[in-house]
Amino acid sequence: MTTTPISLTPGVLAEAVVDLGAIAHNVRLLRERAGSAQVMAVVKADGYGHGATAVARTALAAGAVELGVASVDEALTLRADGITAPVLAWLHAPGMDFGPALAADVQIAISSIRQLDEALDAARRTGTTATVTVKIDTGLNRNGVAPALYPEMVTRLRQAVAEDAIRLRGLMTHMVHADAPEKPINDIQSQRFKQMLDHARDQGVRFEVAHLSNSSATMARPDLTLDLVRPGIAVYGLSPVPRLGDMGLVPAMTVKCAVALVKSVSAGEGVSYGHTWIAPHDTNVALLPIGYADGVFRSLGGRLEVLINGKRRPGVGRVCMDQFLVDLGPGPLDVAEGDEAILFGPGTRGEPTAQDWADLVGTIHYEVVTSPRGRITRVYREAETVER
């Protein structure tokens, strides 16, 4: 897949351009890797910073059949925006009123007896059957029913189904190693999951679907695939296993801004707070009107590069709340105010990538793409990618 250049919208200070063609490509690829399993596209955290509703529509059109989010509020936002496909929400505060979720036909994932009781309370109050998935803990030791409590959960589920209080939709778990599909714990988790699934069946409790595969398992461990796969980061074109390359995925987000000012700096003069960078010779700098309040990590000061007019330009000095500077070098200027500066993108034009940023600051690309905010305007491009 190749990408076509994306121009900065006139009059916009900075923008995160989301290529919906890339999203569609990635979902189609995930469908291929999933084999006979269906795809639940995860659009939590506002679609990993890409916009949940736009991503959801694109993913569904490309072949995903369900959507996954963390909170009920995220699911209700999708419903308010006209999304009618099945949506599963799996992270809930104590005392959650599931009534609005049931009224909106949002599926609830429960991780404890208490959450089951809260879902049953909402079902009885509203006269609506709750569609429930049970999330079990197979080793992550985070959200999910603990193995020791699972037999009691199965008993309670059997009673609730007999009362027609719930529709028992699914059994799910989450992988420990999101970026290491070869780790033995993945197989241990799969074995535990299947044992717990068998226990429920032995007790007369049957789930419509079972699913544990995340992005990395979908792409690299087809033997773990069950009825559904739940890819998240791969939907957005970021490799779930960076050491294995792009895996055929296309990053969907490009962050860019306009050059706000170009000025000369004499040798020996410093720039930005604290003068952490002193010009070694007469040079020129460009001011970019975007800073750590917008998602450009302060720790990138003096470390990041941006692409302007086809050349990588090094950042100099500290990243400020609203702005930072890049060195254009001495001599004749080849950058003017208003020129486009690309902070990160797919990398196809030589610009840095989200993975480059992650490597610089010691984090993961998930954090990079979920960080753009503040004065960055999200813009969508419907067909910026072309199949090869």
From Swiss-Prot:
* Active site annotation, chain numbering: K44, Y273
Sequence positions that bind substrate: R142, M321
Which PROSITE patterns does the UniProt entry name for this protein?
ALANINE_RACEMASE
Q: Return the EC number.
A: 5.1.1.1
* Pathway where it operates: Amino-acid biosynthesis; D-alanine biosynthesis; D-alanine from L-alanine: step 1/1
Record GO biological process: D-alanine biosynthetic process; peptidoglycan biosynthetic process
| Coiled coil regions in record | none
Which controlled-vocabulary keywords does the entry list? Isomerase, Pyridoxal phosphate
Q: Which Pfam families did the record assign?
A: Ala_racemase_C (PF00842), Ala_racemase_N (PF01168)
Tell me which cofactor or cofactors this protein depends on: pyridoxal 5'-phosphate
Quote the InterPro entries the UniProt record gives. Ala_racemase (IPR000821), Ala_racemase/Decarboxylase_C (IPR009006), Ala_racemase_C (IPR011079), Ala_racemase_N (IPR001608), Ala_racemase_pyridoxalP-BS (IPR020622), PLP-binding_barrel (IPR029066)
Catalytic function, reaction form: L-alanine = D-alanine
SUPFAM superfamilies per the UniProt record, alphabetical = Alanine racemase C-terminal domain-like, PLP-binding barrel
Entry-linked SMART domains:
Ala_racemase_C (SM01005)
Q: Which molecular-function annotations from GO does this UniProt entry contain?
A: alanine racemase activity; pyridoxal phosphate binding
What are its GO cellular component terms? cytosol
> Which of the residues bear the PTM N6-(pyridoxal phosphate)lysine?
K44
Under the heading NCBIfam families, the entry gives: alr (TIGR00492)
Function of the protein: Catalyzes the interconversion of L-alanine and D-alanine. May also act on other amino acids.
Q: Which family does the record assign?
A: Belongs to the alanine racemase family.
Q: What is this protein called?
A: Alanine racemase
